[in-house]
Amino acid sequence: MNSFLRKMLLCCIAIMGLNATQAQEDMKLLVGADFDMYFDNREYVDCKFGESQTLFSSRLTPKVGVEWNKYNRLVAAMDLWADHGNNTVVLAKARPQFYYEFDSKKVAAYAGIFPREKMMGDYTDIMVSDSMRFYDNRVQGVMGQYKGDRGFAEISADWCGMYSEASREKFRIMSAGRYYIDNYHRRFYAGYNFSMFHFAGSKLIHDCVNDQLMLDPYVGVRFNAFLDFDVKLHYIQTFQRDRDNDENYRQPKGGMLQLRMAKWGVYIDEQLYLGENLQPYYRSYRSEAFPNGYGGELYGGESFFGTTEHIYNITKVGYDRWFFGNTMRVNCYFAMQYDGTGWGNKQIVSVSVRLLKDIALSKKK
């Protein structure tokens, strides 16, 4: 028996050694850098539900990693931030990224602290605003994705706040999916976006605990008539509760129509929301901890969806295109916005660069 066990052990060690050798033979060194610049000028003097301000920042993310067996990666990176016009601080902040990535034709998985842009879901401005995508660009947790011939599905868990004296405990679960009803032309589709956000206390703040769920099923159609058209109809249902002020969940809801027309990178994007105030705690239920309401700490979407006038309309005219072998992207647009009380506008300019080089670590025989 002991001889048999020794032989089995030696066999397992040999197999593991062979696999390790094969993995090392396929190993590559990854070296790269990401760059993002974001300019966001908002003119909301006549609007009740938006604040006039200018956001202007840049982010450089050098990164290094290893790849093995074609599908596996370990990556370490550092986000280096600078706010334009702030000459008193060299770097506004520096935040790490460390993550494992598995990416095959059908399945992808991530664990650690990884870029939000790895998400495939079409999360609208209701859940994630343009500024949140830039300034909160990391997911701290795990994510799984399935990529099929007729659509995709994904789910992620983001532990975005640690329980301590300096921060509140916060975590967000997001999921999205899309299914193309006609597989040949891929014109008609249906999908959903989902977000569950738990906004808890800290060691210094024991109240103001919020639970928030948002569900956004939609149907859409894509077609070409000289221009590329994409039309989507959404139904938004939310469940929200401030535990200190409400015994039951508030359930604001609404509908949204999206129409996009594009050609040669130039696009017009029309978005019309009709419904209830989707952000009931944004300005209300003031407390000592949040004298002006919970604001953007609780809501990641555009503040205009907190309108009490049952309407929000935004029209974007812009240009969005990749250059130089899909290594540099320019996205800029001018937007007119109406919240039921007045008109406002904003101008967005974003520039992104994605560079990545892989270097084989094994010598070819």
Regions found by a protein language model. Give the residues of each.
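Beta-barrel outer-membrane channel/assembly domains of diderm bacteria
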Residues: 2, 22-103, 260, 345-364
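Exposed, low-structure sequence patches enriched in small/polar residues
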Residues: 36, 97, 148-156, 160, ...
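A short acidic, glycine-rich active-site loop
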Residues: 70, 131-135, 302-304
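Surface-exposed coil loops of outer-membrane beta-barrel proteins
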Residues: 44, 108-178, 198
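A short acidic (Asp/Glu
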Residues: 86-89, 121-123, 203, 243-246
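Residues that act as N-cap/strand-start positions at coil-to-secondary-structure junctions
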Residues: 58, 94, 136-138, 213, ...
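A generic structural signal for short coil/turn motifs at secondary-structure boundaries
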Residues: 11, 50, 84-87, 162-165, ...
